[in-house]
């Protein structure tokens, strides 16, 4: 019960892999992968942009002009992305999402990953 209540008040929406695909296709969502560079190169969601958590924030140049655009944060498991999503919501970003379960959930859904930068 606590988890469900916390989910309602966190300010961002969690997405399943299929929902992420729909959001990218229908609303041109910006997908930001907060994984370490070497993990990103081993496999990431096509079209996602890699930003290290230490240099990520509402003022990051990648997010310039994206306050009303859907922004989906992704990491390996969903933990890092959740913390970053809260910062974006606080800064006034309207449509902030996190891929529930991260890249691991994407792989479990048998969806493809791209290697390299």
Regions found by a protein language model. Name each.
Residues 1-19, 23-29, 37-70, 76-117:
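Rhodanese-like catalytic fold shared by cysteine-dependent sulfurtransferases
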Residues 32:
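Active-site flanking residues adjacent to catalytic metal/cofactor-binding acidic residues
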């Amino acid at each position: 019960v606590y988890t469900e209540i916390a989910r309602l008040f966190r300010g961002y929406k969690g997405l399943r892999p299929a929902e992420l695909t729909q959001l990218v296709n229908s609303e041109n969502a910006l997908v930001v992968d907060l994984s370490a560079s070497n993990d990103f190169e081993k496999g990431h969601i096509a079209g996602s942009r890699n930003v290290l958590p230490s240099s990520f924030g509402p003022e990051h140049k990648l997010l310039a002009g994206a306050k009303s655009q859907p922004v989906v944060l992704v990491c390996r498991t969903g933990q890092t992305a959740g913390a970053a999503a809260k910062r974006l919501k606080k800064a006034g970003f309207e449509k902030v999402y996190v891929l529930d379960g991260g890249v691991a959930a994407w792989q479990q859904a048998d969806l493809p990953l791209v290697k390299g930068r």
